[in-house]
């Protein structure tokens, strides 16, 4: 039951020159729920109807068929619609209970491919907390797109190419110890990388060594290729362990090295179109007409830059997947770079360049401290996830001593807490991470939402009722309507999150639904003898529906929803 559609249809009956789509985009939700469930502003009608908006609203409100509504009234220039709580509420509940997994879904994508590139850690370095944002924002966006009928293709574009990788080889050649690497590959390789960057301040030749090793790799040197394969293998093995903890799974792990094999084609096109210009020994693309700085393609030493691989990658992906959109979930410090990428593709003659979408996000700090792999103050993501699970286990043991699957629930709550904290914040905002605050069962946290649902599931188990097909769902009252009408907003919330590429809309919705349910749980008598059986079953149906919607919302965020906590 789409209340917004009911309003649009009622309005079209008195505005025959307007299409349903034109009306739909004008319909609003009043900030004050006392003003109705939906509102329609009449300002845009003033010019054609040659009347004041207040008069138009009053006239139309009188003409509208109120059969599906409790009331329709004009308030100033707005027409406010109050849905029939009994009939509409029953229809909404029926829709949720009949197909909970698909509730809120809209087939807007029609199966079109959307490439989503996210996480993209550098090989031979551990996944730090800084990778959490890209990984979870990207995964949530992919899930939201799938909910809306698109086919997301998840790509982990590994950072396995570049001069920084040459530095890793140079460091290994100077200080490498195979036994240490076999024992703890990632942290050992990281220590080499940190050391060469630190010592390069006094030994500039170390930077040159790194560039030389990368040049060897580009030209197929066997030793360079051997080291590359080894570093990549041990890194990917470790990454997949973290991805399994997060329940993140990719369709492709092809990285920059794969793209490096295809660089000749974009460079050829750039040369043929006369787009490459010599500048201080390097070759650039002039993007002045886009109000963008020049884009370096070939360095003065003859090595390629990131852009050659990204151009090749974009061309390959369009040819291979025929994408509708190609999304890159990368920090906001890369905004200008992605503008340059799109502009360069346009100059090369690709009309799909505007289908390249950069989803930017703000930096994460830990207890107010910035992180830097180069300086060595990186916070290991796997360690944080394990610590969060331990904290969750401690809280669960205090709340529910006899919980049978406590370890599994602790994983779901602990990891979910970290993920939810990231996604509840608008992605472009910088965020600070404090683990003890994140895992609390109170406040705007993942465990708070999970616990609200678990309370509902406990109530349902105690009732012994699992089938609501014969429930009289018209028996809901004002308290239930507060929950039901809010659940009716779920589809709009998902669509908003999809259109803005902003998972925080889902997280905020889940928090608000949990808050409303906790209030309902505290003030409404359900499993008591003096409550009418039909009313009791209708109330339990509402609890079941809330449980379904919270679980669905958490799933879009890649957060588990345990039935018991």
Swiss-Prot record:
CDD domains: Anticodon_Ia_Arg, ArgRS_core. The keyword ATP-binding applies. Its main location: cytoplasm. A motif ('HIGH' region) lies at residues 121-131. SUPFAM superfamilies: Anticodon-binding domain of a subclass of class I aminoacyl-tRNA synthetases (SSF47323), Arginyl-tRNA synthetase (ArgRS), N-terminal 'additional' domain (SSF55190), Nucleotidylyl transferase (SSF52374). GO terms for biological process: arginyl-tRNA aminoacylation. Gene3D superfamilies: Arginyl tRNA synthetase N-terminal domain, HUPs, Isoleucyl-tRNA Synthetase, Domain 1. It is found in: Cytoplasm. Keywords: Aminoacyl-tRNA synthetase, ATP-binding, Cytoplasm, Ligase, Nucleotide-binding, Protein biosynthesis. GO terms for molecular function: arginine-tRNA ligase activity; ATP binding. PANTHER family: ARGININE--TRNA LIGASE, CYTOPLASMIC, ARGINYL-TRNA SYNTHETASE. HAMAP family: Arg_tRNA_synth. NCBIfam families: argS. This is Arginine--tRNA ligase. It comes from Lactobacillus delbrueckii subsp. bulgaricus (strain ATCC 11842 / DSM 20081 / BCRC 10696 / JCM 1002 / NBRC 13953 / NCIMB 11778 / NCTC 12712 / WDCM 00102 / Lb 14). The lineage of its organism: Bacteria, Bacillati, Bacillota, Bacilli, Lactobacillales. The gene is argS.
């Amino acid at each position: 039951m789409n209340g917004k559609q009911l309003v649009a249809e009622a309005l079209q009956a008195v505005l025959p020159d307007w299409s349903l789509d034109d009306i739909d985009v004008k319909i609003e939700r009043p900030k004050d729920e006392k003003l109705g469930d939906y509102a329609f502003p009449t300002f845009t009608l003033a010019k054609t109807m040659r009347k004041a908006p207040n008069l138009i609203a009053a006239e139309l409100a009188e003409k509208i068929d109120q059969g599906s509504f409790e009331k329709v009234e004009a308030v100033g220039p707005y027409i406010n619609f109050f849905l029939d709580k009994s009939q509409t509420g029953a229809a909404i509940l029926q829709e949720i209970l009949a197909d909970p997994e698909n509730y809120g879904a809209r087939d807007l994508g029609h199966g079109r491919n959307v490439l989503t590139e996210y996480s993209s850690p550098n090989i031979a370095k551990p996944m730090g907390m800084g990778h959490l944002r890209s990984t979870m924002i990207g995964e949530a966006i992919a899930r939201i797109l799938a909910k809306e009928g698109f086919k997301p293709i998840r790509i982990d574009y590994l950072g396995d190419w570049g001069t920084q990788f040459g530095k890793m080889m140079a460091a290994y050649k100077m200080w490498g110890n195979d036994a240490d690497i076999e024992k703890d590959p990632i942290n050992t390789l990281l220590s080499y990388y940190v050391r060469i960057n630190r010592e390069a301040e006094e030994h500039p030749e170390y930077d040159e060594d790194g560039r030389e090793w990368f040049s060897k790799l580009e030209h197929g040197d066997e030793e360079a290729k051997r080291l590359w394969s080894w570093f990549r293998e041990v890194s990917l093995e470790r990454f997949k362990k973290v991805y399994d903890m997060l329940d993140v799974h990719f369709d492709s792990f092809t990285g920059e090295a794969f793209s490096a094999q295809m660089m000749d084609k974009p460079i050829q096109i750039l040369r043929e179109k006369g787009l490459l210009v010599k500048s201080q020994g390097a070759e650039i693309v002039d993007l002045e007409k886009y109000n963008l700085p020049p884009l370096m393609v070939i360095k003065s030493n003859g090595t390629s830059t990131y852009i050659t691989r990204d151009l090749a990658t974009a061309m390959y992906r369009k040819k291979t997947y025929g994408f509708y959109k190609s999304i890159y979930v990368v920090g906001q410090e890369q905004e200008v770079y992605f503008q340059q990428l799109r502009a360069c593709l346009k100059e090369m003659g690709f009309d799909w360049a505007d289908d390249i979408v950069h989803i930017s996000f703000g930096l994460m700090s830990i207890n107010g401290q910035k992180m830097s792999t180069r300086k060595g103050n990186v916070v290991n993501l796997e360690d944080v996830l394990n610590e969060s699970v331990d904290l969750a286990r401690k809280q669960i043991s205090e709340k529910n001593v006899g919980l049978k699957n406590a370890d599994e629930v602790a994983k779901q709550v602990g990891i979910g807490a970290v993920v939810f904290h990231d996604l509840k914040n608008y992605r472009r905002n910088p965020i600070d991470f404090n683990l003890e605050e994140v895992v609390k069962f109170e406040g705007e946290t993942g465990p708070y939402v999970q616990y609200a649902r678990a309370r509902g599931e406990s109530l349902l188990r105690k009732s012994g009722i699992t089938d609501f097909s014969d429930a009289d769902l018209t028996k809901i009252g004002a308290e239930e309507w507060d929950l039901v009408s809010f659940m009716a907003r779920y589809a709009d919330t998902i669509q908003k999150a999809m259109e803005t590429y902003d998972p925080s809309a889902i997280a905020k919705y889940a928090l608000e639904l949990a808050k409303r349910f906790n209030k309902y749980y505290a003030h409404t008598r359900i499993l008591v003898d003096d409550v009418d059986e039909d009313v009791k079953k209708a109330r339990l149906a509402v609890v079941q529906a809330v449980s379904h919607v919270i679980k669905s919302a958490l799933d879009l965020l890649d957060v588990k929803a345990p039935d018991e906590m």
